[in-house]
């Protein structure tokens, strides 16, 4: 599967980072919006740097042009100040879906030779 058109832009709200506020003795959930601002259908997948502390629901999906999805980013309880949080982030990866593909996410879209774009959203923890 070759793709000559690189994936277009997405927007995220918030645009640059995610902030969680103390206390961290309970689970926090923060919502972010991902908007496909391109003219083509995309498949997206979300990765986190810390699987045991951070979760995203839904972790992947398909967005038509101009369509948006609300994602729940959750942070499980942890001992703030006793764990390294410096590199925590979530990464949105997206790629154009093949022409004629059903609107159902497929992991192999990211494993071929098609172009995949990424947007990192660092996570900030306020004490």
UniProtKB/Swiss-Prot annotation:
One Pfam family, short name: Motile_Sperm
Tissues expressing this chain: Sperm.
Acetylation among keywords: yes
UniProt keyword terms in alphabetical order: Acetylation, Cell projection, Cytoplasm, Cytoskeleton
GO cellular component: cytoplasm; cytoskeleton; pseudopodium
Record's subcellular location: Cell projection, Pseudopodium; Cytoplasm, Cytoskeleton
Modified residues (N-acetylthreonine): 2
MSP domain mapped to chain residues: 9-126
Note: Around 30 MSP isoforms may exist in C.elegans.
Main function: Central component in molecular interactions underlying sperm crawling. Forms an extensive filament system that extends from sperm villipoda, along the leading edge of the pseudopod.
Protein name: Major sperm protein 152
Organism: Caenorhabditis elegans
Gene: msp-152
């Amino acid at each position: 599967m070759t793709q000559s058109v690189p994936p277009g832009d997405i927007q995220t709200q918030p645009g640059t980072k995610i902030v969680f506020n103390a206390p961290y003795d309970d689970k926090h959930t923060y919502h972010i919006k991902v908007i496909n601002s391109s003219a083509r259908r995309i498949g997206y997948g979300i990765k986190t740097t810390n699987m045991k502390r951070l979760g995203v629901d839904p972790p992947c999906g398909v967005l038509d042009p101009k369509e948006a999805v609300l994602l729940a980013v959750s942070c499980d309880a942890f001992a703030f100040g006793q764990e390294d949080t410096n590199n925590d982030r979530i990464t949105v990866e997206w790629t154009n879906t093949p022409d004629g593909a059903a609107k159902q996410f497929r992991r192999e879209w990211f494993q071929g030779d098609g172009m995949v774009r990424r947007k990192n959203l660092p996570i900030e923890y306020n004490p």
